[in-house]
Amino acid sequence: YYVRAFSKYGVVGDRSDENGGKIYVNPQSWAILADIVPAERLASVLGAIDGMETKEGIPLCSPPYAAYDERVGRMSGMLPGVYENGGIYNHAGCFKIMADCKLHRAEQAVGTFLKILPDGESNPSRLTTTEPYVFTNCYLKHPSVDMQVGFSWQTGTSAWGLKCYYEGILGLRRTYEGLKIEPVLPDSWKSVSAERVYRGNRLVIRYRNEQSG
């Protein structure tokens, strides 16, 4: 898989990091989105991504840093499982969903999306203590604050969550030539509908999944 970064200290985010942070999800997702993953390497990258995901979602890095690492800086100084240091990072999860959609991995895309949606099965509001209608940046996984939220009202997860649903899963993408419709629907979705205002026109789009059982 792809490493996180290079610094004056060497490589950051690869198998050699004994303190934590052996793998980061963003380099894998964005390598796919940027079309730079060779065909022979794709299975390894996808395996790395899928191996990071938990029942609550996907962390930014895995495993968390156990102690401060001057090569990494701020995030390694956080408690393991808090925010960027191994917390369930929904903003990064959105990038992963878009990568799944690009590869037509419908089950994986929707599976992660359902974990990101507020007040879901894995993140009920009674546990997270946040409003049931608000996207959150991350869920904390340190035992002392398990599944508490971080930055629920100031996060790119909101915009990216909508992008994942409309442009990724439903496949409604704006182009210069017009509106392109290329959905990535799981087999369990028999039908779905959406509304979109595009170039001054209100469109109602209904999907029927002929692959559905």
Show which residues each predicted segment covers.
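Extended glycan-interaction surfaces of carbohydrate-active proteins
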Residues: 1-90, 121-145
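Non-catalytic C-terminal accessory modules of carbohydrate-active enzymes
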Residues: 51-55, 66, 78-84, 95-213
